[in-house]
UniProtKB/Swiss-Prot annotation:
UniProt protein name: Pre-rRNA-processing protein IPI1
Record's function text: Component of the RIX1 complex required for processing of ITS2 sequences from 35S pre-rRNA.
Region (Disordered): 1-38
Family: Belongs to the IPI1/TEX10 family.
Subunit architecture: Component of the RIX1 complex, composed of IPI1, RIX1/IPI2 and IPI3 in a 1:2:2 stoichiometry. The complex interacts (via RIX1) with MDN1 (via its hexameric AAA ATPase ring) and the pre-60S ribosome particles.
Length: 363
């Protein structure tokens, strides 16, 4: 019996089972399931290379984070815009190439309706200028454009804070500002202070109406406007350290062709030596009195480029000095802090007149 049972069990291994339709074959007892797939585990925070989840470096991650915050400068809430400016102030990058993106986003906020946003923006401009010297000069065209727009803005609060931004340029980029935007800045100042360049009845009546509508906040803001005007005139009408350093070079030593050759050379500080000849100007005189008088007139302001010191002085004396002195004298009579600042501006103009007299005597 035992032998028959053993033979029957051995025979089962060689018997092919009959499968029913629709059913799979039975799996053997020693079957191993291999249908699973392995999953990788990623730990980017513990990576030696210190890369983010997207595989970018820390510098690229900072740029991406900065781009996100710069997009919030156009947020509808003024509190959010202020917080973004504070964040940018605290996380200014050391890479100068990122500042182009920063200035492109924050410069339009000069015209922001919120006073807190504009105040924070002034601090941010100063921080950028201190961290990256010369960075404001690279973006001075767009900055000056928005500053002049703020100085002539319809909103009085925006006009009141406009000279705070102008003061930043006077402190950190005085030469670039005076060379490229002296005439435009002076004309914007006349609009800001409700002054007139001409004595015609229409302009005078408009100035009287505008000054009568000035509120208390605007009158208080005139103190800051006059203080910045004083600094602007000092930087534009008097030689700075860079100009004096250039003037120390004696052309007679450099050019040794003839002992008096320097008398016939064009000064290096003069950008438009032949501008009075108007060789490239296609314009007709509006008044016969303006012909060959050797002075600049209001009609010439749109075509003047006052890049050198002599041209700026001549433009100021011929066009701006008389109305500026007239309006400053009226402010001096008011007294108080406004009169004190106006008197300091008059001191700058008096110093200019004395220096011009010395130059005329030396010639």
């Amino acid at each position: 019996m035992a032998t028959k049972r053993k033979k029957a069990q051995k025979a089962k291994d060689f018997v092919k089972p009959k499968l029913k339709v629709g059913k799979t074959a039975a799996k053997p007892d020693n079957h191993t399931d291999t249908s699973f797939t392995a999953k990788t585990i990623s730990l980017p925070n513990q990576s030696i290379a210190k890369k983010s989840k997207s595989g970018v470096s820390e510098e690229q991650k900072q740029e991406i984070d900065l781009s996100h915050h710069l997009s919030l400068t156009k947020h509808h809430a003024s509190a959010t815009r202020k917080e973004v400016l504070i964040y940018i102030d605290q996380h200014l990058p050391s890479n100068p190439s990122l500042y182009k993106q920063i200035f492109t986003s924050i410069i339009p906020l000069i015209l922001d309706q919120s006073a807190s946003v504009r105040t924070t923006l002034v601090a941010l401009f100063n921080k950028c200028a201190n961290m990256q010297p010369g960075i404001l000069e690279l973006h001075i065209r767009s900055i000056a454009l928005f500053i002049h727009s703020a100085m002539t803005h319809l909103h009085p609060e925006i006009r009141n804070s406009s000279t705070k931004f102008l003061n930043v340029l006077v402190e950190h980029a005085p030469q670039s500002l005076s060379k490229s935007f002296f005439v435009k800045t002076m004309r914007s100042y006349f609009t800001l202070m409700s002054w007139t360049l001409t004595d015609d009845k229409k302009s005078v009546s408009l100035a009287i109406t505008t000054s009568a509508a000035i509120g208390g906040s605007v009158k208080k803001a005139r103190i800051g406007h006059l203080a910045v005007l004083k600094a602007f005139l000092q930087a534009s009408l008097f030689p700075q350290l860079s100009d004096s350093a250039e003037s120390e070079i004696n052309p007679a030593i450099v050019v040794s062709v003839h002992p008096q050759s320097y008398k016939y050379l064009i000064p290096a500080a003069t950008s438009q030596a032949f501008a009075p000849l108007k060789l490239f100007a296609n314009e007709l005189p509006n008044n016969s009195k303006d012909i060959d008088d050797g002075k600049f007139h209001i009609s010439d302001l749109d075509t003047i480029t006052a890049e050198d010191l002599d041209t700026r002085r001549k433009v100021f004396v011929d066009v701006f000095q008389k109305p500026v002195v007239k309006n400053l004298n009226s402010l001096v009579k008011e007294g108080g802090e406004v009169g004190r600042e106006a008197n300091s501006c008059m001191t700058i103009i008096d110093n200019l007149e004395q220096e011009l007299k010395k130059v005329a005597e030396d010639e």
